[in-house]
Structure formats: C-alpha cells, structure tokens
C-alpha cells in the first residue's frame, strides 16, 4: 500500500536520548531505555540489532533490556545481534545467559582487516526502528549521553533492515562472495530512500564506500556537501573531530571535514559552534584539533566548548534546515574504513527539535569554554 499513500512529515520519527543521572537537565524526549523496551514489547516476528559490541549487563537498565530480549526469544521471536569480530569480549557470558538469541560476529573488511562495524541500530518486523549513537551496552542505555531516532513507520524500518542484511552478509565465520571480496556494491535494491528521494524529509547515509550498494549515499559526501553549502550556521556536537586516518599504526592526514569547517568560517562567514567531548575514549588528536580550529578562526565567528560529562552524542545541524545524527566521529579512520548508518532529515520539526537539544547542551553548566 506504500506507493499509494503519502509519507507523514518526518516519517514518524521521534528523537531519543540517554541522559546520565548526574546531569543538570532532563530530556523531553523518549529515553533510549523506553525506545528499546517499546521495540521489544511490540515485536511479533523478529528483532535485529547491530552494534560494535554488546555489554548490556553493565548497568541495571541495560540488564532489564537484555532480560526483555531473553523473554521475547523464549516466546519464539527471532532475535539476531550483529557484533564486530573485535567487539565480542562478553559474547560467551551472554550466550550462556540466553542461548535462544543468535549472536553473529562480522568482519566487514577481511581484505585489509581495518574496518569495524560501528553501526548502532535496531529493526523489528519491518515496522519499527532505532538508529543513533547508542550501542547495545548498559552505558549507552543508562549512563552515557546519547542521541538517536525512533520511528514506527514501516517503509523507513524496511529500508534500515536492508542495511542489516548488508552487514549480516559479512559473517566472520561463514564464507560468502561478499566477505571474500569485501564488497557489497552489487546488492540489489539496497535502499529506497536517499538524498534525492527522502521519505517524509528523511533518509539514511552509509559508510564505508565498499558497502554502499545500489543508490546509497556515501555519508562523507553528504556531510561535506552540507558543510560546504552552509550559508548561515553550523552546529556540531561530537565526541571528536580527527583529521587523520590510521592504518597499521601509522597516521595519514585526512582534512576533508576539517577543511570544510574552516572554509565555512573564514571564506563565507558562517557562524560555527563546536561542542566536543572530553573523556577517556577521545582520540589523542581530538583536543588538538579543537584548539587548532579555535586558533585558526580566532577572527571569525567560530566558538568551541568542551562537554565535561561522558557524551557520545554525534549531531550536526546546518542552517537550521538539515540534521545529521550518526554513530561515527568526524574521524578519517571512521569515514574511510568503518561500517555505519547515519540518520538525515530536512523535516522542519525534526531539525527544530534537534536544534533545541544542541542549544540546551551548549548553554548547560556541563559545557565549558575551551579557553578555561
């Protein structure tokens, strides 16, 4: 029936947050715990989850979600959790706790062995989905600040499930033509919605390039295009901006996003606000990059702040007209090698709601000037 019905504005998407209890503000949006709980409760056929690692038992709310998944699997609901081969540290414990859940490890880059599965998303019954920066860990569900999107619009869920099928084809145990050649470029009907054909103003973007498939948009192309076309404002809330790519222990300069930010500030007078994370998961280059942006654009309208509580939110807003939510840092290694799916929207309401989140975070007591 989809071809004969118009898509609702925003494809029925709602923003989803995890806020640690020690923050000085609360969220008006669905929590990640509530989102995952709803997906499990409403599931009738299947629940598919993609995450770099799986450690839900590390917090009470994470354990509650895993127990709900266990109950669903015991009722006959098919549950598959995709993990990166290098993120399976807790796999044995989880399998013994719930043998009915199918855990599959993937290696999206057997040829060079540098790419990881970074994608953080859930799909159920081709009807509901979550995509964002909350991995399937207790921290992401309870104690680390994250941002994502939940939709119960079936066409969008179906489109995200196609990405799950792509990653699943890179099963690290089984051999297939996909993981033998590290290429999924010929996957049929790999996406229905993209930058030239959004649904309700919403579309997904993908990375890395060798996993694109037919008609998918490369995430870095869309992000850089939006940065380069910005006219008035760019707001970025990210764990890290790192203009390098690491291969075999060596670092190589990857200035694409970094230069696009500088050009927007200096050449076009765009107002830029950058809110970066500052915790132990940061790349060593992250703060140096933030400081260099601040120094290079000292005579321009570019401001940098540091968020002092664990913050894995990865958010980009351009001209108050476009929002991008992802699981990857603005990091050359992530964009060149790792596998993930990002959420994009030009829907006015979704952009406005994301902007309010950024403004709240920017003025909060947890955001400190880089110069302090």
Swiss-Prot record:
Major envelope protein that plays a role in the biogenesis of the viral double membrane and in egress of virus from the host cell. Produces the wrapped form of virus that is required for cell-to-cell spread. Acts as a lipase with broad specificity including phospholipase C, phospholipase A, and triacylglycerol lipase activities. Signal peptide: none annotated. Interacts with protein OPG190. Gene3D superfamilies: Endonuclease Chain A. GO terms for cellular component: host cell endoplasmic reticulum membrane; host cell Golgi apparatus; membrane; viral envelope; viral membrane; virion membrane. Pfam families: PLDc_3 (PF13918). Its main location: virion. The lineage of its organism: Viruses, Varidnaviria, Bamfordvirae, Nucleocytoviricota, Pokkesviricetes. Belongs to the orthopoxvirus OPG057 family. It is found in: Virion membrane; Host Golgi apparatus, Host trans-Golgi network; Host endoplasmic reticulum membrane. Late-budding domains (L domains) are short sequence motifs essential for viral particle budding. They recruit proteins of the host ESCRT machinery (Endosomal Sorting Complex Required for Transport) or ESCRT-associated proteins. F13 contains one L domain: a YPPL motif, which might interact with PDCD6IP/AIP1. Residues 307-334 form the PLD phosphodiesterase domain. It is a lipid-anchor. Its EC number is 3.1.1.-, 3.1.4.4. A lipid is attached at residues 185-186 (S-palmitoyl cysteine). One of its GO terms (molecular function) is hydrolase activity. Disulfide bonds: none annotated. It comes from Variola virus (isolate Human/India/Ind3/1967) (VARV). It comes from the Viruses. A motif (YPPL) lies at residues 153-156. It catalyses: a 1,2-diacyl-sn-glycero-3-phosphocholine + H2O = a 1,2-diacyl-sn-glycero-3-phosphate + choline + H(+). Induction: Expressed in the intermediate phase of the viral replicative cycle. Palmitoylated. Attachment of the palmitate moiety is essential for correct intracellular targeting and protein function. This is Envelope phospholipase OPG057. The gene is OPG057. CDD domains: PLDc_vPLD3_4_5_like_1, PLDc_vPLD3_4_5_like_2.
